[in-house]
Each structure stands twice: as C-alpha cells, then as structure tokens.
C-alpha cells in the first residue's frame, strides 16, 4: 500500500492536487486528499498571505516525494512556478491544447509574477487569451495567489524586445547589451525609472530573471544635463556604497536623487533620505 501511494504521487510531481486542511502546525500544514492520504504543505512553500483553517479546501502542486523512515512523504507547494503554470492550464484551454506555450515563469510569491507566453498560430493573441475578456481568465488565478500581480508577456527570441516587454509598464528608450557579461544597460526617461524598478524592486528583479540578464537602469540624458551634478562629485560627503546603490537603480545625478521619494530611496536601505537630499 505504501509503495502504491509513493508511486501514485511520484508520477504526479508537478501536478495540482486539491485537499482539505486537517491539521495546522507552526511550520507546516497537513492536508488530506480525497482518499484520506496525508500530504504536507511546509510554511516556506506557502504564499505569505496564505491563511488556512481546519476544514478549508486548498490547492497546491506536488513539489516532491520523499521517503522518511520507510514512509512516503508528499511535499506540496503554492510558491513554485509550476503551480502558477498549472493554474494557467486550468483557466486557458489554448495552453492545454498546445496552441499557446508557456515559455518561462518567474515569481516573487504573493507579490508579482511574470509569465512569458508564445503562440505559433498568428491568429491567436497569446497575451489576450491568457488574460481573457476583461481579465476574466486571469482574475481567478490572481485570487488563488492572494492578489499576486501577474504580468503576461508576449515571448520573443529578440532579447532587447523581450527586456523592453518585461519591464512594462515602464517605457524604455534604449538598451545596450553585453552578451559576454550578461548585462543589460537600460535607459529610460526620468519619470519611468521608478516604474521599471517597481515596488520593492520586484519588477526589475523579475525582468532580469525572465530574460537571464542582469539589468541596470539609467536615467536618459536630456538638455538639462549640463545644469545637473554627477553623483561622483559628492564622494567626499556620501559613502561610496550609497553612490553605487543609487547608480544601480539609474540615479546617477543630484537632480535624479531629488526627484525620488523617500519611500523609493528607502528601498535601497538608505536610512537618512532627508540628510542625503540636504547634501
């Protein structure tokens, strides 16, 4: 019986299962499947805003199957990219039918996800099909993931175009790629820099994971550049690591720093934004 249980779930790794919450501990939850088998959802595999009570129905993906003291242990996950992919398969028939392919998924569970999709049929808009009329298809997925923001991106093998799409909603001016180092320098208008970075830096971090490049954003130069002062001029008054952090998110001049809010500056762990502005 144990061998059958082990084999059943070993063959279901990567698939969605539905079960009932049976017992709740500090670091994990026990789920019972429809046959009364015990499955484990560790806290680290839960979305931060997940909250379950005994008797609740829940869905997760089978992450792995282990043997523990000769007993099968089934580990579930709600944070794995595969969970999001299976949810899309349930909501979007074109994916299950093979008309749309999910090329890659990256997630910051509960915060944001980026899903690159592609269709070999020119008559199908893969992004529109995944989102659905007025968001009808994606809304259910977002609710399941506790309001995780999901960006569906039309995949392309053109890296520059893929970077541009993955940084949406920011409007990119130009991109310089270094294939040897795997770095991409992205230039944007000043008012687009914070959009590219996103709340908590999630947008730029996920875009980098999606395309496989380290993305650095820079404020686009303009006619007022000669009235501005390069941050390097403040090296005697501002710690070098702070200047490097600011440059890393596209803030390379005094004016660009002044245009940022205290909240945005705090994202890079600057504890005294007021003092920084005064300098």
Q: What label would you give each PLM region?
A:
Residues 1-275:
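RNA-contacting regions in translation and RNA-metabolism proteins
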């Amino acid at each position: 019986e144990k061998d059958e249980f082990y084999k059943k779930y070993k063959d279901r790794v990567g698939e969605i299962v539905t079960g009932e919450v049976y017992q709740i501990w500090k670091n994990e939850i026990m789920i019972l499947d429809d046959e009364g088998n015990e499955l484990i959802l560790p806290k680290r595999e839960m979305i931060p805003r997940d909250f379950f009570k005994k008797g609740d129905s829940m869905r997760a993906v089978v992450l792995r199957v282990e043997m523990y003291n000769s007993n099968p242990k089934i580990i579930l996950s709600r944070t794995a990219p595969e969970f999001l992919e299976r949810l899309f398969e349930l909501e979007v028939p074109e994916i299950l039918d093979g008309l749309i392919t999910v090329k890659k998924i990256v997630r910051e569970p509960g915060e944001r996800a980026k899903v690159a999709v592609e269709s070999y049929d020119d008559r199908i808009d893969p992004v529109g099909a995944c989102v659905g009329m007025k968001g009808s298809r994606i809304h259910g997925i977002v609710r399941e993931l506790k309001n995780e923001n999901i960006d569906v991106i039309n995949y392309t093998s053109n890296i520059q175009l893929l970077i541009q799409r993955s940084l949406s909603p920011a409007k990119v001016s130009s991109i310089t790629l270094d294939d040897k180092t795997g770095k991409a320098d992205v230039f944007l208008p000043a008012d687009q820099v914070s959009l590219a970075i996103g709340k908590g830096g999630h947008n730029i971090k996920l875009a980098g994971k999606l395309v496989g490049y380290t993305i650095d954003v820079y404020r686009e130069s303009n006619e007022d550049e000669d009235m501005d002062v390069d941050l390097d001029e403040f090296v005697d008054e501002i710690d070098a690591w702070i200047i490097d952090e600011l440059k890393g998110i596209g803030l390379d001049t005094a004016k660009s720093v002044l245009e940022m809010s205290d909240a945005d500056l705090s994202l890079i762990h600057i504890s005294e934004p007021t003092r920084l502005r005064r300098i």
